[in-house]
């Protein structure tokens, strides 16, 4: 069933190429269509007319989704509770602080930073969009964001919880207003805190040039 925030997600798709693991691209790089195989700006849907390419894309995507789900569940004290929540169509509650910290950025800054990091071919770990709060959440390695002081962003405390849908929930879908912009692929790869800070700072500076005040 379409999410009530679908219109918002359509706008995001128009701005961003959907980010996902693929046979020809590293995690978070923009080289081939995502799981829905949509013809988004910058994609090459004609390649999918080749049955072999289509099959490889589907197999790689399915494998990454399964691996990402298992990785997230393994970060919880009771992995079965994570899968039970997903099977019930709910958000799973996974503790932060041990395996990652969460950097939260207001949506305009966060989306711009995602685009900038991909354009620079920097690795992106899992990224969530929380539409109801207008926030983008980045998973970063614990201890890599000490002294964070960038306006428009916050670093959650180590005791916070990640509320996340199953990794297959991507635009144009959402669960309780949350969707993955970059779903986990099971490798455990996270966003580098320093590179994320640079991308967010650049996004903020660019916004200031056009008069945005965040």
Where are these regions (language model features)?
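Elongated alpha-helical scaffolds
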Residues: 137-140
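Compact nucleic-acid interaction/catalytic patches
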Residues: 147-149
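Signature for HUH/AEP ssDNA processing cores
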Residues: 2-132, 142-145, 156-157, 169-214
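Charged interaction scaffolds used for protein-protein
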Residues: 151, 158-162, 202
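Short glycine/Trp-rich loop-beta-loop segment that forms part of the substrate-binding cleft
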Residues: 165-167
């Amino acid at each position: 069933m379409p999410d009530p925030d679908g219109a918002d997600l359509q706008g995001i798709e128009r701005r961003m190429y959907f980010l996902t693991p693929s046979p020809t691209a590293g995690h978070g790089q923009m080289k081939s269509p995502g799981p829905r195989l949509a013809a988004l700006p910058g994609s090459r849907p004609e390649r999918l007319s080749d049955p072999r390419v289509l099959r490889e894309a589907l197999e790689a995507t399915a494998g990454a989704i399964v691996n990402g789900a298992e990785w997230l569940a393994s970060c919880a004290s009771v992995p079965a509770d994570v899968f039970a929540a997903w099977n019930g169509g709910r958000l799973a509650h996974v503790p932060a602080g041990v395996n990652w910290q969460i950097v939260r950025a207001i949506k305009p800054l966060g989306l711009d930073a995602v685009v900038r990091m991909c354009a620079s071919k920097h690795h992106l770990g899992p990224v969530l969009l929380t539409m109801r709060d207008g926030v983008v959440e980045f998973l970063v390695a614990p201890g890599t964001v000490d002294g964070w002081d960038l306006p428009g962003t916050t670093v959650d405390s180590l005791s916070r919880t990640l509320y996340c849908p199953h990794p297959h929930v991507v635009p144009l879908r959402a669960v309780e207003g949350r969707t993955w912009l970059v779903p986990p692929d099971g490798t455990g790869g996270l966003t580098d805190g320093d590179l994320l800070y640079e991308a967010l700072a650049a996004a903020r500076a660019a916004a200031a040039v056009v008069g945005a005040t965040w």
